[in-house]
Amino acid sequence: MEINVKIKPNMRIQAFYLFFIIVSMQIGVGILGVPRLVFSEAKQDSWISILVAAAYVIIVLLAMLLILKQYDNADIHGIHRDIFGKWLGKIFSTVYILYFAIAFYSVLLTYIEVVKVFVFPDVSNFVMGLLLISLTIYGVLGGLRVIIGVSFVFGVLANWILFLLIHPALQIDFNHYLPLFQAPFVDLLKGARATSYTFMGFEILFLVYPFIQNKNKVRISSLLAVTWSSLLVLSATMLAIGFFSAEQLERREWAVLVLFKTQSFPFVERFDYIVVAELMMVVVPSLLFLMWGLTYSMKRVYKVKQKLTLYVAAIIFLIGTFFFEKHFETQRVINFAEQFGFWFIYVYPFVLLPLVLLKKRLKKRKGAGSS
Amino acid sequence: MRKRMKRSSKNVFPLKIDELEQLMKSEFDKSPDLSFSKYEHQNKKIAVFFIPYQVQPDRVENLLLTPLLESKEEWSNTAILNKIPLNSGKEYQQMDEILPGLIAGKVMIYIEDEAAVVSYDFLNKEKRSLEGAETESVVIGPKIAFTESLVTNLNVIRWNIRTPDLAIEEITIGKRAPREVRLIYLKSLANDTDVDTMRQRLNELDVDNVEDSNVLMQYIEDDSASIFPQFHTTELPDRTSYAILKGKIAVLMENSPSALIAPSTFFSFFESTEDLYMRWNSGSPLRFIRFMSMFISVVLTPMYVAAVTFHYEIIPTQLLISIGQSRAGVPFPPVFEALFLELMIELLREAGARLPTKVGQTIGIVGGVVVGTAAVQAGITSNILIIFITISALASFTAPSYQMGTSIRLLRFPMIVLAGILGLIGIMFGLCMLIIHLLKMTSLGRPYLSPIYPIRFEDLNKALYRLPQNFQYKRFISLSLKDSIRFSKRNAKEKKDIDE
């Protein structure tokens, strides 16, 4: 396995799309439930928590970019190979692959759960799983260009649902935000920790970085993406806190979805149904990228054909949907994904960064000594 | 067969006139159409042979036979070619050149003991005259349509694009029954890779015959499994030359009244030349209406089915009451009701397309008005659904390309079934599948959904809407043409201050 990836010229993508890649990975079903999670820790000071979390995400992102900059055109698997050697590197990469699998599974189950709660209480997991997984297979078979296209087109198309939030936004009670600065520092951090599942997804940068043509635009594009998703999460949380009273909010698992119920037109009511359907457009790009990450990583690390991984993983996930029918089971998967992702996405780059810098310095010294 | 081919590729000349007659008779043994006449002139035997209905008899008489027989001098091949200076004079030596030549309306002259046959082209091809477009009718702008004659069509195109820059390449397609195909593009504009791809696809086509350019399209398109057409076929010369001038490639085929335009994008199928002739601020909304109606046509009936079957909560109470009253007597689930009505509309359309125009109109009235009213009164369908079905059928007919309109109309059926099974989730699944499919498609190797993905902001003003002409100083960037500037931006109007 080479450390640096050679990309065919027709597979290169513009950094412009990185914005949509990262936003579509970050904004998924997580945003629907995040207000309650943050609120139960930080109460009306949730906005501080989210700002703290966003700042932390940006720091992690900058660290990731710094790591990637040390190489010509490497992805995370190449870096693992370079830093940890053949076998240890493979183990770390395998953990990454496992992360993609678990994240895929948690997104899949969460969307099925939302559909069950809001639209079809009796729909079987298998049918919904079949729909989503067949979309995933069909999309991933198109390759990275198509997946990025999906994230871009769906990312633009799904934005109309934001306009439906204008109506609830006009009915906010500003007293819900007061008094300011009440939460102790620990609670604020706990609140920030609660957003970790929602903000996950920017780690895809570690994989798509070699594909990007204009590397000088990567930083601005990814920073804008993270800022935009942070803004969305922040406004969703603020809306939910302003609209619902404290005990209402704590009892509503998907508070943001409930907000859509208030909007109505002479010909359509109950927009939550439509929004849940529209959410498929938000969820599918995440699923596609996670599945692509899984198959591409398998190809990079173990030289398995992507098609083989795709079909096998799809069948396993489809069978897997049978075993997590209940709410608490789904919740367990999400919690596990969150735990796993937290250490892997938010902490691990800071372990990798000094190692990469050290290795580079050693190499430089060696090069200087030999010449 | 193989034996005969071998023999005819051999040079049989020189030979006696009687031997030639025997040979020709044996070649044409199953079709007694060959006219083989022998003359004696200045002690030399001359044979003239041709297929009478493939040539223009009076021209043959006046231009060829009269000078041939009335002359006093002795004829030889060179003498004939010199004395009868029609530009199509040629010498042939091989049988497999002579036989297709006879079929293509050539008159052959053989002088005994010469080494070759002299031929002149007198092709008489029956054709209809240029008429107005039938399937792609336009309100303003040129109205003539292509005919079945390639020469006429080329004439029209040449007259539209009067520049030597226009390349018209000749390619022959089909093994058993060959047809001429022309590849037309602007040398200084069209992308070389695209032209090469197209030429290669046409040259490598290994089929025994191709019926029409619509069939040709199916042979050479990128993804034959897709429901969407990947090349545009049009019967408007106007539209074809517009596409050529934009840097695209056109393919014309003998005996086919439609041209093929490549590469095409999804959005170009909703583009009518009328948009250009209208002013930009009335052309853009018209195009927008077409996009809207495409969406409506795919989604409206499925939405109704989904709402009435599963999610009646999304219908406001006032509306729900009227829908409920209208549906009260209907014994079928909404899916069947919708499928039944959609099928009826398709029947009407199909019957209307097959029948003569006058009868077709009657059928439309009988089918639409009488059966529709009767179906509602009999309690089989609801009024409101009929309204939705009619709107979506109308919407599907707004697509300027008939092929695209048909694809969209057919897409409704799986969407209705999906809506009937899984409601809004099913519709969304269908839409997602559709968009992913469109993203995967290519036309001549170029993305089908361009310029949306990959996004080219400069192209949006031509593909999705139109701006005034002085904003359109660039050609489509996504086509990567040799010259993408239409005119200098400086020539566009300068800004002025208020006039005092």
Predicted region positions:
Chain B
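Generic detector of multi-pass transmembrane helix bundles and their immediately adjacent loops
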Residues: M303-A306, P316-L319, P331-E500
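Short aromatic-rich membrane-water interface segments that cap or initiate transmembrane helices
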Residues: G283, I321-P333
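Membrane-embedded alpha-helical signal segments
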Residues: M1-V299, I314-T317, L438-E500
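Functional cleft and adjacent loop/helix regions within the main domain
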Residues: H311
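Membrane-interfacial loop-to-transmembrane-helix junctions in polytopic alpha-helical membrane proteins
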Residues: M278, S282-P285, S326, G352, ...
